[in-house]
């Protein structure tokens, strides 16, 4: 989506951008390091911070800056309202495909809540995860996408599916400095139906443009 927008902008200046689909940030990073791509979006937090900030970076890669926020949406099915990830213990959770930034971040957040990597964590992403959640075959799904992305809009409007508001958003931001806390305002989806009925607190890394 964002790559296509940049391709359109660059085309106006005579620059042709070849868009390559990938599983996500980890694969993008690998392609950049292997010179299989010259420019890529990489999710904040994917590259661990250097133990010694004074040591020179020898990766050969350069960040041109943070381009936009990528909210982390945790959708779930449950009779009660959940506000903490620890409440998903023992549930079947879609955490994204291997090589994706959503999978890495989901693992970091779940590890922090003592939720082990076992057969309850399934490698589903996007609309595939949304369909499984709608059908009740999984209990929760991590989605990283813009608010306007089809998968987010589909799940927000799905009967029986709820969106988690992170009660511990400040604690996550303190523990994971690459995350920013954002608010999904009350009524933003539908003013007439007043949906969502309350502000939703979400977390978001940034997408960085790497060359």
Question: Which residues does each predicted region cover?
Answer:
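Extracytoplasmic small-molecule ligand-binding "clamshell" domains
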Residues: 1-39
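A structural signal for short loop-to-beta-strand junctions that line the ligand-binding cleft
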Residues: 57-67, 191-200
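Pocket-lining segment of extracytoplasmic ligand-binding domains
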Residues: 111, 117-210
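Second-shell loop/turn segments in exported
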Residues: 16-19, 29, 60-61, 91-99, ...
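Beta->alpha turn/N-cap motifs
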Residues: 21-25, 35-48, 126, 143-149, ...
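Bilobed "Venus flytrap"/periplasmic-binding protein-like clamshell domains
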Residues: 1-13, 70-135
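Extracytoplasmic/secreted cell-surface and envelope-processing proteins
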Residues: 28-30, 49-52, 83-84, 102-105, ...
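Membrane-embedded segments
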Residues: 22, 26-38, 44-47, 58-59, ...
């Amino acid at each position: 989506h964002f790559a296509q927008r940049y391709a359109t902008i660059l085309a106006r200046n005579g620059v042709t951008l070849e868009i390559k689909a990938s599983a996500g940030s980890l694969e993008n990073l690998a392609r950049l390091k292997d010179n299989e791509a010259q420019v890529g979006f990489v999710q904040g937090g994917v590259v661990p911070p250097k133990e010694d900030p004074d040591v020179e970076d020898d990766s050969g890669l350069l960040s041109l800056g943070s381009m936009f926020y990528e909210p982390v949406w945790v959708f779930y099915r449950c009779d009660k309202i959940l506000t903490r990830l620890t409440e998903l213990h023992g549930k079947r959770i879609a955490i994204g495909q291997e090589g994706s930034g959503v999978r890495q971040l989901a693992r970091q957040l779940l590890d922090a809540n003592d939720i082990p990597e076992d057969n309850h964590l399934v490698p589903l992403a996007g609309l595939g995860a949304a369909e499984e959640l709608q059908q009740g075959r999984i209990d929760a799904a991590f989605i990283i996408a813009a608010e306007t992305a089809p998968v987010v809009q589909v799940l927000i409007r799905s009967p029986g599916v709820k969106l988690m508001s992170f009660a511990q958003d400040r604690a996550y931001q303190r523990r994971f400095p690459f995350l920013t806390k954002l608010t999904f305002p009350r009524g933003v989806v539908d003013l007439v139906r007043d949906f969502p009925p309350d502000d939703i607190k979400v977390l978001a890394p940034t997408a960085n443009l790497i060359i």
